[in-house]
C-alpha cells in the first residue's frame, strides 16, 4: 500500500476545528485516533485545509500513509470505510477511502474550495444551529450586488496562517450569489487557489 485519500463530512458543532489542538478536541484528532485503531498503527491524517471552531465540512479531503496489507482487519478500502464509520462518532463520517499516487497531497494538490453560507428567515427546526436566522425581510438584489464584489482575483495574504508556507496568497473567487429556497438563502462560493 502507500498513500490513501479519504473524503469525510462532519458536523463541527462539538469540535475546535479540523486541526489537532493541544487542549481541545478536533475532528483531526478523532479521525486519527479511530483510523490508527482500525489500521493497527499510529496514523497521521493531513487535511485539505482547516476549519474554524463549530464549522461543518462536506466533502473534505484528507490523506494518510499506510504500509499495511489487507487481511484479517478488512478485505479492501470499502470494508475499511464501513468499519471506520462504525467507530466514529455520529457527527463525523467518511464517504470513501481510496488509494492515490505518492505525489497526491490533500492540501497541496487542492485546486479549488467551495463554501456555502446559510441564512434562514422562517422557523425551520432543521436549520436551527446550522444557519443564521434573520427576523426581517431581506433585499436579495442588494445582497447579490454586494456578493458580486467578492468575485475577483486578488491578494488574500491577510487571511493566511502566519508561517503557513503557502506558495501563493493570490485567490480567484469565481462565484458568489445568494439563492432562495423556501425559507432560507444560501451563498455558495467557489475559489481557486
Feature-to-residue mapping (PLM):
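Short amphipathic alpha-helices in soluble, non-transmembrane regions
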Residues: 75-87
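Short, charge-patterned binding micro-sites
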Residues: 43-69, 104
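Conserved small/polar residues in nucleotide/adenosyl-binding loops
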Residues: 1-9, 183-189
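Short secondary-structure junctions
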Residues: 37-43, 88-93, 154
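Non-catalytic RNA-recognition surface used by pseudouridine synthases
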Residues: 92-185
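Short beta-strand-to-loop capping motifs
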Residues: 8, 64-68, 119-121, 136
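Short catalytic helix/loop segments, enriched in acidic residues and glycine
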Residues: 24-34
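Short acidic, Gly/Ser-rich segments with clustered Asp/Glu that frequently serve as metal-coordination loops
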Residues: 13-19
Amino acid at each position: 500500500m502507500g498513500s490513501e485519500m479519504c473524503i469525510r463530512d462532519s458536523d463541527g458543532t462539538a469540535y475546535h476545528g479540523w486541526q489537532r489542538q493541544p487542549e481541545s478536541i478536533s475532528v483531526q484528532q478523532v479521525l486519527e485516533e479511530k483510523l490508527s485503531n482500525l489500521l493497527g498503527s499510529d496514523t497521521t491524517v493531513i487535511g485539505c485545509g482547516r476549519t474554524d471552531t463549530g464549522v461543518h465540512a462536506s466533502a473534505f479531503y484528507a490523506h494518510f500513509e499506510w504500509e499495511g496489507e489487507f487481511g484479517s482487519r478488512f478485505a479492501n478500502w470499502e470494508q475499511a470505510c464501513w468499519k471506520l464509520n462504525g467507530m466514529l462518532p455520529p457527527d463525523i463520517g467518511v464517504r470513501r477511502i481510496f488509494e492515490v499516487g505518492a505525489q497526491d497531497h490533500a492540501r497541496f494538490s487542492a485546486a479549488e474550495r467551495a463554501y456555502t453560507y446559510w441564512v434562514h428567515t422562517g422557523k425551520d427546526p432543521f436549520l436551527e444551529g446550522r444557519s443564521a436566522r434573520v427576523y426581517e425581510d431581506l433585499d436579495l438584489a442588494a445582497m447579490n450586488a454586494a456578493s458580486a464584489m467578492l468575485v475577483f482575483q486578488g491578494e488574500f495574504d491577510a487571511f493566511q496562517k502566519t508561517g503557513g508556507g503557502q506558495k501563493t496568497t493570490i485567490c480567484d473567487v469565481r462565484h458568489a450569489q445568494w439563492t432562495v429556497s423556501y425559507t432560507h438563502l444560501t451563498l455558495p462560493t467557489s475559489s481557486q487557489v
